[in-house]
Regions:
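Conserved N-terminal phosphate-binding loop of PLP-dependent enzymes in the Aspartate aminotransferase
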Residues: 1-404
Length: 404
């Protein structure tokens, strides 16, 4: 029995909690950089599930890896080992030039994991008094929507009316090295065990920090004996033209937090990747996940890692990203107030229309994007997009901008 668009929308409205306000597109199938709705209309996906689809929809290599594993075993709890787990951990550690991996499922779980690990490291390695550890975060951050994470968010939608809030965090302005230094040099500085930072703030509108900021954070963390934890859940795995966005400043953090693209757009796969000194503080029973590191997730993630090995996706992101950012930067300044991004990742802030209206207009033109923070839209095309497809999408964006 077929169900038409209005019926599907009615079912969503009636039975789904209203924690999302989706654009009026109901996807039925997808391949590569394109999705098709229930009425057979095609759209160029220039959002790629916030970087979860770096390799596009249903990439043949990832589908093949999934099918191979589906035919063998999909889940065993961490009470037992399996033949995909060790190789996955070794290969991801090697890709990140780190020692150890702690796999989870969602990005928020990886962030929560890092908070627990940083605190325990602070107590057992640094000697910070128990229950006194602090973690420095940044204004405009987005690290997830769990209770602890929203406690240090300054986004009213994410934060307000979800208290009481988890203590133990200090927030400073993003990109402000002086503020970071002042915290370390102030009365609470000796309690700061980690700095949690997005190399580029995605949810905030793809905000790129000032040149030298990440290197400065790295230097201050080293000087003050604190961990630098890089949340690369959106920015990592090729999105910015590098395997990791931190590499743009030759910065190596103490830990990477990875997710989204690590699951190939098929499974939720996330991980904290760090040194033995850091992850080695955990003992059996102190952290875990029934599904984290399951055979199917590991098999898919191993194929993702293999696809990133030769750097071709990273180079493609850098090259096509230059084209995209150049075209977007040429949009009329009377219409667009700011364009920012790196690689195939951009935020475009409009003067004359809310971001939602722009995204609805783009959807009518066959392009999928998503608004954030009022008048900004986010663009994150899959890294497999062709030059012709990118040109087609950018032409539609230019057309919509011209009509505003």
């Amino acid at each position: 029995m077929s169900i038409d668009l209005s019926d599907l929308s009615d079912l969503t409205s009636k039975f789904s909690a209203r924690n999302y306000a989706p654009l009026p597109v109901v996807v039925a199938s997808a391949e590569g950089a394109w999705v098709t709705d229930v009425d057979g209309r095609r759209y160029l996906d220039m959002l790629a599930a916030y970087s979860a689809l770096n390799f596009g929809h249903r990439h043949p290599r990832l589908i093949a890896a999934t099918i191979r594993q589906l035919e063998r075993v999909t889940l065993v709890s961490r009470a037992f080992d399996h033949d995909q787990f060790g190789p996955f951990c070794a290969e991801l550690a090697d890709l990140a030039d780190m020692d150890m991996v702690l796999p989870m499922n969602t990005g928020a779980e990886a962030v929560e994991t890092s908070i627990k690990v940083a605190r325990k490291w602070g107590y057992t390695v640094r000697g910070v008094p128990v229950d006194q550890a602090l973690i420095m975060v940044f204004g405009g951050n987005f690290h997830g929507r769990t209770t602890t994470i929203v406690s240090f968010s300054d986004d009213p939608d994410a934060h307000d009316e979800f208290g009481p809030y988890t203590p133990g965090f200090i927030s400073v302005p993003y990109g402000d090295l002086t503020a970071v230094s002042d915290v370390f040099g102030g009365p609470l500085g000796s309690r700061v065990v980690a700095v949690l930072v997005e190399p580029i703030q995605g949810e905030a509108g793809v905000i790129v920090p000032p040149a030298g900021f990440l290197a400065g954070v790295r230097s201050l963390c080293t000087a003050n004996g604190a961990l630098m934890i890089a949340d690369e859940i959106q920015s990592g795995l090729g999105r910015t033209g590098y395997t990791f966005a931190c590499q743009a400043e030759d910065v190596v953090p103490d830990a990477y937090l990875l997710g989204k693209a690590l699951g190939g757009g098929i499974m939720p796969v996330s991980a904290m990747v760090s040194s033995r000194d850091v992850l080695g503080v955990l003992r059996p029973g102190q952290h875990g996940s029934t599904f984290g590191g399951n055979p199917l997730a590991c098999a898919i993630a191993r194929e993702v890692i293999a696809m990133l090995r030769d750097g071709s996706y990273q180079r493609r992101s850098a090259a096509l990203g230059t084209v995209m950012l150049d075209r977007l930067s040429a949009l009329p300044t009377a219409v667009v107030s700011d364009v920012h991004g790196r690689g195939l990742w951009a935020g475009v802030t409009f003067r004359l229309a809310p971001g939602r209206a722009v995204c609805e207009a783009l959807a009518r033109e066959g392009v999928l994007a998503k608004e954030t923070h009022g008048s900004t839209i986010r663009l994150a095309p899959p890294l497999i997009i062709t030059e012709e497809e990118l040109d087609w999408g950018l032409s539609r964006i230019e057309s919509v901008a011209a009509e505003l």
